A protein has these predicted regions:
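Histidine-dependent nucleotide/RNA phosphoesterase domain, centered on the 2H-phosphoesterase fold
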Residues: 1-178
Length: 178
């Protein structure tokens, strides 16, 4: 079984800006620069034959390159159950279309439908026992985040492996947009 997801990495300049915001919350496990990405679809653990089917379907996706920018920050969870902080994406129809294509590819490969609504974001930190005051202050300090636009010309099929400081991601297959 291999744990897989479709995503695209961020340009270094965008990741570097985000890394400067990764402070101010005790109990936060800030994601390393090289792990920052935008997930298009999480597939979960798959046997190798299903992963091959998924790769075939993802490689058939056709789409054009598009510009994207970060906009705003938020949290997953509520109150004392907040478990992650993230940077959001400016509304972008080509991004949403690419995510829908990844969902259709998953269905054609025999995977179950994703029941959660797609919310494009970059996870910046996972939280454990973080102060709600600190989290609230961090959101207020960073809520006007707006990055320069950047070009998305590819995405990939990534695997996730347990690591000493959280999951380690490895690009298994790259896919180009034209």
């Amino acid at each position: 079984m291999i744990r897989l997801f479709a995503a695209f990495p961020l340009p270094e300049i965008i990741s570097a800006d985000l890394s400067r915001r990764q402070k101010g919350i005790l109990g936060a496990r800030w994601r390393p620069l090289e792990s920052l990405h935008v997930t298009l679809r999480f597939f979960g653990p798959l046997p190798e034959n299903k992963a091959d089917d998924l790769d075939s379907e993802l490689s058939a996706i056709s789409g054009r390159t598009f510009d994207l920018s970060l906009e705003g920050v938020g949290v997953f969870g509520e109150g004392v159950d907040v478990h992650a902080v993230w940077a959001g994406m400016a509304p972008n129809e080509p991004l949403m279309q690419l995510a829908r294509q990844c969902e259709r590819a998953a269905r054609r490969a025999g995977l179950a439908r994703e029941m959660r609504a797609y919310r494009p974001h970059v996870t910046l930190a996972y939280l454990r026992n973080a102060s709600t005051d600190e989290v609230g202050a961090w959101v207020q300090q960073n809520n006007l985040l707006k990055s320069p636009s950047f070009l998305i010309s590819r995405f990939g099929l990534y695997s996730s492996w347990p690591g000493e400081n959280g999951a380690v991601y490895r690009l298994e297959r790259p896919y180009s947009l034209s």
